């Protein structure tokens, strides 16, 4: 069954709502430019109150390696997601499993994948002004080609209206949603979360990676 990550968690209420709806993982954004940004202290407080078996993922953009590792330790993060221009050797220095995000403009955007040794790749829509959370989709044919050879987490403009088509097209290991289940930036919508996860979990995918 496909894995679902709800990203941009900023408060305990939304975190528990996502867990109760069936989310496999929660994402915390450690990037001050984002309207969904949290401090390590805020994230740690939420994570301490989560039930077991829920994966916690920290999103970073071009932060120093020491800051990433310190934050991961302080918050008890399970996985680190890197959304900037972090090089393969940088990723190797992270003391957690790593998901490397790539912003997809065309097929050439995936060429760096062969150089990385990471747990998974997250594919998001390319934007000249943001490293994620834009609400934009991209060419899923490109993602499908990548998913045939790699463990892929699909992101970018996903909503309850298009998630079934996305899963059937790409066959990803997991899907990642943030703005698609929000009432406002940083505040989740209960109905949207439940519907998104329900449809994602009910949609048949051939992915078993």
From Swiss-Prot:
Keywords, in A-Z order: Amino-acid biosynthesis, Aromatic amino acid biosynthesis, Isomerase, Tryptophan biosynthesis
Class of enzymatic activity (EC top level): isomerase
Listed Pfam families: PRAI (PF00697)
InterPro entries: Aldolase_TIM, PRAI_dom, RibuloseP-bd_barrel, TrpF_fam
Pathway involvement of the protein, from the record: Amino-acid biosynthesis; L-tryptophan biosynthesis; L-tryptophan from chorismate: step 3/5
EC assignment: 5.3.1.24
Gene3D superfamilies for this protein: Aldolase class I
Catalytic activity: N-(5-phospho-beta-D-ribosyl)anthranilate = 1-(2-carboxyphenylamino)-1-deoxy-D-ribulose 5-phosphate
GO BP annotation list: L-tryptophan biosynthetic process
Keyword Membrane tagged: no
Disulphide bond pairs: none
Similarity-based family: Belongs to the TrpF family.
PANTHER family: N-(5'-PHOSPHORIBOSYL)ANTHRANILATE ISOMERASE (PTHR42894:SF1)
Database matches in HAMAP family: PRAI
Protein's name in the database: N-(5'-phosphoribosyl)anthranilate isomerase
Taxonomic source organism: Pelobacter propionicus (strain DSM 2379 / NBRC 103807 / OttBd1)
């Amino acid at each position: 069954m496909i894995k679902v990550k709800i990203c941009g968690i900023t408060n305990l209420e939304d975190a528990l709502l996502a867990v109760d709806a069936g989310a496999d993982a929660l994402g915390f954004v450690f990037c001050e430019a984002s309207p969904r940004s949290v401090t390590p202290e805020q994230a740690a407080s939420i994570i301490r109150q989560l039930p077991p078996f829920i994966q916690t993922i920290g999103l970073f953009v071009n932060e120093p390696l020491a800051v990433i590792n310190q934050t991961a330790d302080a918050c008890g993060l399970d996985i680190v997601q890197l959304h900037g221009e972090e090089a393969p050797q940088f990723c190797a220095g992270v003391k957690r499993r790593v998901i490397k995000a790539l912003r997809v403009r065309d097929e050439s955007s995936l060429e760096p994948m062969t150089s990385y040794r990471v747990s998974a790749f997250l594919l998001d829509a390319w934007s000249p002004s943001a490293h994620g959370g834009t609400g934009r989709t991209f060419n899923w044919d490109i993602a499908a080609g990548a998913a045939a050879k790699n463990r892929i987490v699909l992101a970018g403009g996903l909503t309850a209206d298009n998630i079934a088509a996305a899963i059937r097209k790409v066959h990803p290991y997991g899907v990642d949603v943030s703005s698609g289940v929000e009432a406002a930036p940083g505040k989740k919508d209960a109905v949207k979360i439940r519907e998104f996860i329900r449809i994602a979990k009910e949609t048949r995918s051939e992915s078993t990676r």
